[in-house]
């Protein structure tokens, strides 16, 4: 396991996407098949793809939507499970022999590469869903031979069945590997539920493995900028090229790439150094020969049954294994925790050499062969990756690792925390954690919120608070926008954001442009006073949080708007949110949640060149919405006048603030002709076909519900005369879903 460690099987001509001999060895990249268009996406690639909102459909889940993983996990004998995993790690199998008779290094690499796909910009990736089982991750060059690691785990999964998910098992295997080596981890939380098809994720625009040109805009200089939201420098790698940028063995240049990519996984310099040093304390890389390995699992012949990268050299395993093409053994205590990585790194001078497979790596200069062979052969000289030497040569990393050389206990503490963060970064709040090994203390990166320590409000309190809100002088749009701003920061990918904690009143969210800080300055003090007045007079130990008041106020506004439209409804409300503090809020970490656009509020920035309708669907994906829910919410929010800045774009009604289906009625009215605005970018004018008078204005966030055939079909449903009530019901249901997205306590 490494920043890429066992990354890239070699092929016969040793060429990569950039056609550079210096990146030898490289995988024989599968090429896109040329064919006539076969799908709608082939014919109309610019059309927004709404199908992404229906991934992970329960129809593909063999357990159905009622399966309760937490209940199944509660039946697990965790001590027996742990003992079985450790026994597996220490028992070499003939079909894939373990280095030094121990699979610790292999399992650490598997767990790291499962978790290491996480990226901060959209919260995608990570170990939380067992995605490594599926393409493309199961066939990435960086994940070569991890198919064997997962296959080794199958007897454990088979034995414990539904009580342990693949996602938890893959993540825990690395934790167990560290513990059985003598390392004391910071704990472990179960609770990852499996998905049953690949996660919807753009890994890059390159069409060859190991390509870099698109994410860097064709630049290869030292100041090149990695495009967002990507977290890796190279297509098919977890982080960086272990031989250095573009295969050029420059440790300082490698350090630059390491810092950027690990930062995009939410790791600082100390955490990054700890992960590399700790992760390379166990295991080795494999590059026994310059041979052409077979195709990856997705391209392998059927008879290989999901195993790929078949190696024709010697036995194809053991000392004849070819994985990355790098042949590096970091320590002589390969299966035991030690400080030997740093002792070797600083106890030797390093000279550049090549592995038997032709990959750039470093070997200890004038050193004796002191590293035991994993299968009893002649001892080896100490070796390091280019990215390992970066931990010494880079001034910042060097200062950190030199300190750890003399104080290994500090390194152990740093690695324990960094490893726990790596394994759990995409799991969301601790309320989702399961098992007996969850640390008692929360870290700030977990976005902690206080536990409920008081009696909750009841139905009569809720009714009284709603009445106070509606008599406060705040308008329906103000209340709806505030509740939406609080809840819509949620990301279903890494379970961050949401209304719980009321972080809308804290930095950085208080001053996000999308949240209209000037409006918040008017609304929040009023809601805070309502909260304070209630808490000062309530009896029976009852209290209400501002987080609850914000959501309750928005729901009260929706009820009023529906009533004004002729529909008596009750918006379901579940109290139990609490208020976070500024001290428990990592401003820098939360900054990546700031919406650059939000089509639900018709918020966008001038000059934005990314299609608004695609960004709207992406926002809906992060909110875990279906296409019907997206459609109902847009129609309702426009009717309620909840646009950013009070803009009239898409407000196709003469009674804003009333919950009606007017948005759909007027969008589909053929008496209106739409044309791009001559005055405003990203704006369209809706003109009366008879008079030429401008009736409405809109953005792509609005017109996509008339232009996209799937969304238009849904819009037509809500425009029907017999579906006005259905629209109100569907809008309210979708509204409640968004308000409760982060209420994991309600889902247990």
Curated annotation (Swiss-Prot):
Residues annotated as binding heme b: 280
Record-listed cross-link Tryptophyl-tyrosyl-methioninium (Tyr-Met) (with W-112), residues: 239-265
SUPFAM superfamilies with a match to the protein in the record: Heme-dependent peroxidases
Known EC number: 1.11.1.21
Annotated catalytic residues: 113 (proton acceptor)
Residue segments, region Disordered: 1-40
Record has 4Fe-4S as a keyword: no
Gene3D superfamilies reported in the protein's UniProt record: 1.10.520.10, Peroxidase, domain 2
Cofactor(s) in the UniProt record: heme b
GO biological process, one term: cellular response to hydrogen peroxide
Any one GO CC term of the record: cytosol
Molecular function GO labels: catalase activity; heme binding; metal ion binding
Tryptophyl-tyrosyl-methioninium (Trp-Tyr) (with M-265) crosslink, residue number(s): 112-239
Post-translational modification remark: Formation of the three residue Trp-Tyr-Met cross-link is important for the catalase, but not the peroxidase activity of the enzyme.
Bias type Basic and acidic residues, positions: 1-14
Pfam families: peroxidase (PF00141)
Cofactor detail note: Binds 1 heme b (iron(II)-protoporphyrin IX) group per dimer.
Residues the record marks as site: Transition state stabilizer: 109
Catalytic activity of the protein: H2O2 + AH2 = A + 2 H2O; 2 H2O2 = O2 + 2 H2O
Keywords: Heme, Hydrogen peroxide, Iron, Metal-binding, Oxidoreductase, Peroxidase
HAMAP family: Catal_peroxid (MF_01961)
Stated role: Bifunctional enzyme with both catalase and broad-spectrum peroxidase activity.
Quaternary assembly: Homodimer or homotetramer.
Protein family per UniProt: Belongs to the peroxidase family. Peroxidase/catalase subfamily.
Protein name: Catalase-peroxidase
Species of provenance: Mycolicibacterium gilvum (strain PYR-GCK)
Designated gene of the protein: katG
């Amino acid at each position: 396991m490494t920043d890429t460690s066992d990354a890239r099987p070699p092929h016969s001509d040793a060429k990569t996407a950039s056609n550079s001999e210096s990146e030898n060895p490289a995988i024989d990249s599968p090429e896109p098949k040329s064919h006539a268009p076969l799908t709608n996406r082939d014919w109309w690639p610019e059309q927004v793809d709404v199908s992404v909102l229906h991934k992970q459909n329960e129809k593909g889940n063999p357990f159905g939507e009622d399966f309760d993983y937490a209940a199944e996990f509660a039946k697990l004998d965790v001590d027996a499970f742990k003992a079985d995993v450790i026994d597996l790690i220490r028992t070499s199998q003939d079909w894939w022999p373990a280095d030094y008779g121990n699979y610790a290094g292999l399992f650490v690499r598997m767990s790291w590469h499962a978790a290491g796909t996480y990226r901060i910009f959209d919260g995608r990736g990570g170990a939380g869903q067992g995605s490594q089982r599926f393409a493309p991750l199961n066939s990435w060059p960086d994940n070569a031979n991890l198919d064997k690691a997962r296959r080794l785990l199958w007897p454990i999964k088979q034995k414990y069945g539904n009580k342990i998910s693949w996602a938890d098992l893959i993540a825990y295997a690395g934790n167990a590997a560290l513990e059985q080596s003598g390392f004391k981890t910071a704990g472990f939380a179960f609770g990852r539920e499996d998905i049953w098809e690949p996660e919807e994720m753009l890994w890059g625009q390159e069409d060859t493995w190991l390509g870099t040109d698109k994410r860097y805009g064709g630049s290869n200089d030292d100041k090149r900028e990695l495009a967002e939201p990507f977290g890796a420098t190279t297509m098919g790698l977890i982080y960086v090229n272990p031989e250095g940028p573009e295969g050029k063995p420059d440790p300082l240049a490698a350090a630059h790439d390491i810092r950027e990519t690990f930062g995009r996984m939410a790791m600082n310099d100390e955490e990054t150094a700890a992960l590399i040093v700790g992760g390379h304390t166990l295991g080795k890389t494999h590059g026994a020969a310059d041979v052409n390995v077979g195709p990856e699992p997705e391209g392998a012949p059927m008879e290989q049954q999901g195993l790929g990268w078949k190696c024709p050299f010697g036995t194809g395993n053991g000392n004849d294994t070819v994985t990355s093409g790098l042949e590096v053994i970091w320590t002589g205590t390969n299966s035991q925790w030690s400080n030997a990585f740093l002792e070797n790194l600083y106890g030797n001078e390093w000279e550049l050499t090549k592995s038997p497979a032709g990959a750039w790596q470093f070997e200890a200069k004038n050193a004796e062969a002191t590293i035991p062979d994993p299968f009893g052969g002649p001892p080896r000289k100490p070796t390091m990756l280019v990215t390992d030497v970066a931990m010494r040569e880079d001034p910042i990393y060097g200062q950190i690792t030199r300190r750890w050389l003399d104080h290994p206990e500090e390194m152990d503490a740093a690695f324990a925390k960094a490893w726990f963060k790596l394994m759990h970064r995409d799991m969301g709040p601790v309320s989702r954690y399961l098992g007996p090994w969850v640390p008692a203390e929360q870290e700030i990166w977990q976005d902690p919120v206080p536990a409920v320590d008081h009696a909750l409000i009841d139905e009569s309190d809720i009714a009284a608070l709603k009445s106070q809100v509606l008599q406060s002088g705040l308008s329906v749009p103000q209340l709806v926008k505030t509740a939406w701003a609080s809840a819509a920061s949620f990301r279903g990918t890494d379970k961050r954001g949401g209304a719980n904690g009321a972080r809308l009143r804290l930095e950085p969210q208080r001053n996000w442009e999308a949240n209209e800080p000037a409006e918040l300055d008017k609304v929040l003090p009023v809601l805070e006073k309502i909260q304070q007045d209630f808490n000062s007079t309530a009896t029976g130990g009852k209290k209400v949080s501002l987080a609850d008041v914000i959501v309750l106020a928005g729901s009260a506004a929706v009820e009023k708007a529906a009533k004004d439209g002729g529909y008596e409804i009750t918006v379901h409300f579940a109290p139990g949110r609490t208020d976070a503090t500024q001290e428990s809020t990592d401003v820098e970490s939360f900054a990546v949640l700031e919406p650059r656009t939000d089509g639900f509020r018709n918020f966008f920035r001038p000059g934005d060149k990314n299609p608004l309708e695609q960004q709207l669907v992406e926002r809906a994906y992060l909110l875990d919405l279906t296409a019907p829910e997206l459609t109902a919410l847009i129609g309702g929010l426009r009717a309620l006048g909840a646009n950013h800045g009070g803009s009239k774009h898409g407000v196709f009604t003469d009674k804003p603030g009333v919950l009606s289906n007017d948005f759909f009625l007027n969008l589909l009215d053929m008496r209106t002709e739409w044309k791009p605005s001559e005055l405003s970018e990203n704006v369209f004018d809706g003109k009366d076909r008879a008079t030429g008078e401008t009736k409405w204005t809109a953005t792509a966030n609005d017109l996509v519900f008339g232009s996209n055939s799937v969304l238009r079909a849904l819009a037509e449903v809500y425009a029907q005369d017999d579906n006005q009530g259905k629209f109100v019901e569907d809008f309210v249901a979708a509204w409640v879903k968004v308000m409760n997205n982060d209420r994991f306590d309600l889902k247990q």
